[in-house]
C-alpha cells in the first residue's frame, strides 16, 4: 500500500503543478497516515466457458470511485471507449466503440477516478472502462489482477479546489449538498452495486 500510495502521490504532484494548485493540495489529502477508504484488491475473472457469450461484460461500464487506480494485470480483458465512440444513448457506447487496453510486462495501468474529477471541477476526467472476457486464447485462463485504489482522507470535503485552472462552481453546483470523502465513497459504491444487481 505504501509504495502504491507513493506512486499515486507522484502522479498527483504532477497534476497539482498542471492545475496551478499550491504544492500539497492533492497529495496532503492522500497520506497513508490519514483514515481513508484506500484499498488493495485481488480480482478474479473466470476463464471463458463454451456456451457463454465471450463479450458479456465481467464488470459493466463504469468509472472508479477513487482518486487514482493502479492496476497490475497480465491478461487482456480491460476495455475503454474510443474518443469518438458511437453512442446508443447518452450513457451507452456501441459494442464497436470499445477498444482493448493491452497489458505490458513490467507495467501498470493507471486510471484517474471520480474523486479527482470532483476536486478539479471536471478539468480532470475520470476514465470510463469495463471488463470483458480476455481476447483469443487468453480467454482460456482465469484472469487475476491486483488493483490499488487511493481515495482522499475520510474528512476531505468533496468540493472543487481553488486554482486559476479550475473553474468556479455555477450557482447550481454551489447548491449541491456537500459531503465528505467517506460518505461520498459509500454513496458511490452503493450506486455501482445497484447497477450490478440490475445486470
Regions found by a protein language model. Give the residues of each.
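Basic, alpha-helical interaction scaffolds
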Residues: 1-2
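C-terminal flanking tails of non-heme Fe-dependent oxygenases
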Residues: 5-199
Amino acid at each position: 500500500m505504501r509504495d502504491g500510495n507513493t506512486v499515486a502521490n507522484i502522479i498527483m504532484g504532477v497534476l497539482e503543478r498542471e492545475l496551478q494548485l499550491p504544492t500539497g493540495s492533492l497529495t496532503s489529502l492522500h497520506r497513508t497516515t490519514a483514515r481513508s477508504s484506500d484499498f488493495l484488491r485481488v480480482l478474479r475473472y473466470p476463464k471463458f466457458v463454451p456456451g457463454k457469450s465471450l463479450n458479456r461484460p465481467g464488470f459493466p461500464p463504469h468509472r472508479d470511485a477513487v482518486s487514482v487506480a493502479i492496476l497490475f494485470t497480465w491478461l487482456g480483458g480491460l476495455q475503454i471507449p474510443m474518443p469518438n465512440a458511437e453512442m446508443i444513448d447518452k450513457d451507452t457506447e456501441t459494442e464497436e466503440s470499445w477498444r482493448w487496453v493491452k497489458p505490458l510486462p513490467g507495467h501498470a495501468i493507471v486510471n484517474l477516478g471520480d474523486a479527482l474529477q470532483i476536486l478539479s471541477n471536471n478539468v480532470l476526467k475520470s476514465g470510463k472502462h469495463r471488463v470483458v472476457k480476455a481476447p483469443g486464447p487468453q480467454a482460456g485462463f482465469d484472469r487475476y489482477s491486483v488493483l490499488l485504489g487511493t481515495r482522499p482522507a475520510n474528512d476531505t470535503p468533496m468540493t472543487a479546489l481553488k486554482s486559476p485552472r479550475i473553474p468556479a462552481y455555477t450557482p447550481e453546483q454551489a447548491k449541491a449538498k456537500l459531503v465528505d470523502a467517506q460518505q461520498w465513497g459509500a454513496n458511490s459504491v452503493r450506486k455501482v452495486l445497484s447497477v450490478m444487481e440490475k445486470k
